[in-house]
Regions:
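Alpha-helical structural signal
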Residues: 26, 83, 94, 120, ...
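Generic recognition of short, well-ordered alpha-helical segments
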Residues: 27-28, 63, 121, 151
Length: 179
């Protein structure tokens, strides 16, 4: 499965599970994540969540360039129920990008490698971020002539110094966990 959702006592763990693809987001993965997040919010036994990526190379590299991005841009039609949910259910994109979806429990990001584009946008919606020394962060969309879709233009500048946020957003350059 592209998402592993486990519960242990009061802790929910969400693991993006596509390590060979740097945990890139596909329609199926974002739908499963949205559904798991809804379960997390609604389960009174759960008190904290941990969001991570499988493997040690990437937390999440963002949207899958072959499936997710062509679907959202309209370059390919919906071919299955996962695709249709992404396009027709606003909840799916709101919850999976951790924006416009209220979570009243702490959500911790355990960042174990590259955290790019949509992956970084998800992290902006978490409460605590713990990054491995080798983690890198970037919003490289500007290099493709597009902007981040999940609110990073606003959320990033509210969470880090404005000048640093502008540099990241306007250059697409990566920063390391150490920086």
């Amino acid at each position: 499965l592209p998402l592993l959702y486990t519960k242990s006592g009061a802790i929910a763990t969400f693991t993006l599970n596509r390590p060979a693809a740097r945990n890139a987001l596909t329609p199926e993965l974002v739908c499963r994540l949205a559904d798991a997040l809804r379960d997390f919010v609604e389960d009174p036994a759960l008190r904290v969540g941990i969001l991570t990526g499988a493997g040690d190379k990437a937390f999440c590299s963002g949207g899958d360039l072959g499936t997710m991005l062509p679907l959202i841009s309209g370059d390919r039609p919906a071919t299955d129920d996962w695709d249709r949910r992404v396009l027709e259910e606003p909840f799916v994109m709101a919850a999976s990008s951790l924006r416009d979806f209220p979570i009243d429990k702490p959500l911790i990001a355990a960042i174990n490698g590259a955290c790019m584009a949509g992956g970084m946008e998800m992290v902006l919606g978490t409460d605590i971020r713990i990054a491995a020394d080798h983690a890198v962060f970037a919003l490289p969309e500007v290099r493709r002539g597009v902007i981040p879709f999940a609110g990073s233009l606003v959320r990033l500048a509210r969470q880090i110094p404005h000048a640093v946020a502008m540099e990241l957003l306007l250059t697409g350059e990566a920063v390391t966990a150490v920086q």
